[in-house]
UniProtKB/Swiss-Prot annotation:
The lineage of its organism: Bacteria, Pseudomonadati, Pseudomonadota, Gammaproteobacteria, Pseudomonadales. InterPro entries: HflD (IPR007451), HflD-like_sf (IPR035932). It is a peripheral membrane protein. It comes from Marinobacter nauticus (strain ATCC 700491 / DSM 11845 / VT8) (Marinobacter aquaeolei). Disulfide bonds: none annotated. This is High frequency lysogenization protein HflD homolog. It is found in: Cytoplasm; Cell inner membrane. Belongs to the HflD family. It holds the Pfam family DUF489.
Length: 206
């Protein structure tokens, strides 16, 4: 896997897109369907030719992530930006814990592979697949002491279909966090090379 700023920015955009969709669902009960499919599809990209291929091969697939990334890292201090950043940092922390749990990694990998048939049969945004992926997250990542507190409208979050989407997207966020680390990303980068990431994300949006 390439360790360039380009690849790190793409992976961060994927992570940011998942976090953004979690926020949208938690507050509004809906999100962009194409962006959702991109995130879920990334879980099944096990042998990508490039980082962009993980997300479908086109920059348009992660345009929402690139757009929000260039905004939230600019530290304008908007409450919605802070919330997305919190989700992103929490997912990066959870991925670091997961890396030290090879047995759990194997379980997740095997169960995602089992879900591949559901994905190919029903599509990446079907409730059957989202429920399947949500159960993987609940049975594995959710058992860590560090847990992501999703804030939003309680009535919306109590609906099973919304809870499933949120958990499936958090699992996709972990996938992007893995990709980011594999391409050379680390937490300090978000502080010290933030401006470079913002600049490159904006270049990719042109």
């Amino acid at each position: 896997m390439s360790r360039s700023l380009h690849d790190q920015t793409l992976a961060l955009a994927g992570l940011c897109q998942a976090a953004t969709l979690v926020q949208q669902i938690a507050h509004n009960g809906n999100c962009n369907e194409d962006s959702l499919e991109t995130c879920i599809r990334s879980l099944f990209a096990t042998n990508p030719a490039s980082t962009l291929d993980v997300y479908g091969g086109e920059l348009s697939d992660i345009r929402e992530g690139l757009t929000v990334l260039s905004t939230v890292l600019a530290q304008h201090g908007q409450p919605q930006d802070v919330e997305i950043l919190r989700y992103m940092f929490n997912l990066i922390q959870l991925e670091a814990k997961l890396k030290r749990s090879p047995d759990m990694l194997d379980v997740i990998g095997n169960r995602i592979e089992q879900a591949r048939h559901t994905a190919s049969h029903f599509g990446y945004s079907h409730s059957n697949l989202l429920g399947n992926l949500a159960s993987i997250y609940a049975d594995t990542i959710s058992t860590f002491r560090l847990r992501i507190q999703v804030t939003g409208n309680p009535q919306i979050l109590q609906r099973n279909e919304n809870a499933d989407k949120v958990r499936a997207l958090l699992l996709a966020g972990i996938r992007s966090a893995v990709l980011w680390r594999q391409s050379g990303g680390h937490r300090w980068q978000l502080i010290f090379t933030r401006k470079k990431v913002i600049s490159h994300a904006r270049e990719l949006l042109r």
